[in-house]
Amino acid sequence: MSESVQSNSAVLVHFTLKLDDGTTAESTRNNGKPALFRLGDASLSEGLEQHLLGLKVGDKTTFSLEPDAAFGVPSPDLIQYFSRREFMDAGEPEIGAIMLFTAMDGSEMPGVIREINGDSITVDFNHPLAGQTVHFDIEVLEIDPALEA
């Protein structure tokens, strides 16, 4: 077990993620279940990993990440247009609804219904927090915890 967070550590944390307007987007404290972050496996943004490096058990840190260091900037390439006929099996979509779509490789990806205009439905596949500055409040609970098999 390492004494501080390293570039390949697994870290058990409590965190709260807030937006610029102060609303909480996500918090592990709400359900009392901490999150396991794995550094170095590309599941976290580089900006987030940089803020975790060197922290020790019991450390608390608060920091902000600009969009390009967090969930990215919205890409127009990730906005797709579908015919209403393609939604017949799923039922009538509603603006703001998040639906799962099957990608060409068979994986599923969430998309947000942004607009319904006649026979055309606009779906946004950008991360819901893309383009947002996010504010983290993180407490390190454990580094490289022994995981149950």
UniProtKB/Swiss-Prot annotation:
Keyword Isomerase: yes
GO CC aspect terms: cytosol
Enzyme Commission number: 5.2.1.8
GO MF term (any one): peptidyl-prolyl cis-trans isomerase activity
Keywords: Isomerase, Rotamase
PPIase FKBP-type domain residues: 2-72
Gene3D superfamilies found in the cross-reference section: 2.40.10.330, 3.10.50.40
InterPro entries in the cross-refs: PPIase_dom_sf (IPR046357), PPIase_FKBP_dom (IPR001179), SlpA/SlyD-like_ins_sf (IPR048261)
GO biological process per UniProt: chaperone-mediated protein folding; protein refolding
Disulfide bonds: none
Activity regulation text: Reversibly inhibited by Ni(2+) ions.
Catalytic activity entry: [protein]-peptidylproline (omega=180) = [protein]-peptidylproline (omega=0)
Biological function: PPIases accelerate the folding of proteins. Substrate specificity investigated with 'Suc-Ala-Xaa-Pro-Phe-4-nitroanilide' where Xaa is the amino acid tested, was found to be Phe > Leu >> Ile > Lys = Ala > Trp > His >> Gln.
Family membership noted in the UniProt record: Belongs to the FKBP-type PPIase family.
Protein name: FKBP-type 16 kDa peptidyl-prolyl cis-trans isomerase
